[in-house]
Amino acid sequence: MIYIRFIFFALLLSEYTAVSAVSVGENSPDCLLDSISPHKDIVKLEHPTNKVLYVDFWASWCSPCAKSFPFMNHLNRQFEERGLQIIAINLDENPDDIIPFLRRFPASFSIVRDKNQQCAKAFSVQAVPSTYLIDKQGRVRYIHLGFRPSETTQMLKIIQQLLDE
């Protein structure tokens, strides 16, 4: 089953070659996303928001994604009142895979779904998890692929710097 998901994600990524990658310093793309809530609201990711955005692309089958959720919960507790907004964008093909994942790894931050992969294409996502830190003016300031607990100190420093600007 993991092999099939890998093949699906590889095929998904193959569509990104024609799209130029979002780079540090560029404006963040605007996206329409589906809320993971009983109301099924449409969420618009747009800028500027006067908040620092931590945008994380993830999938339920991704082991590093699961490891990143406690860190994002920690960030949300520590920095939400200072203006950090965490938006975790799910890329699963089957939306039914999301709820069991969230039961195992609860989230205190916004979870949305990119059902047509349009936001992932706009950001030129190459791997999951992929994290984009976006400043209050809507510029991408930091991009990180993967998740390793040993690298969280650097990310904390960057978030604090962006919140202080």
What are these regions (language model features)?
Residues 1-9:
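Sec-dependent signal peptide recognition
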Residues 8-32:
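N-proximal helix/coil linker or "cap" segments that precede and/or mark the start of modular domains
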Residues 29, 77-117, 122, 128:
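Conserved segment of the thioredoxin-like fold in thiol-based oxidoreductases
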Residues 31-53:
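A short beta-strand-turn-helix
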Residues 51-53, 57-61, 127:
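Short pre-active-site segment immediately N-terminal to redox-active cysteine/selenocysteine motifs
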Residues 54-56, 88, 132-133:
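Hydrophobic beta-strand core positions in alpha/beta domains
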Residues 57-74:
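Conserved redox-active cysteine motifs that mediate thiol-disulfide chemistry
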Residues 100-107, 115-158:
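Thiol/disulfide oxidoreductase modules built on the thioredoxin-like
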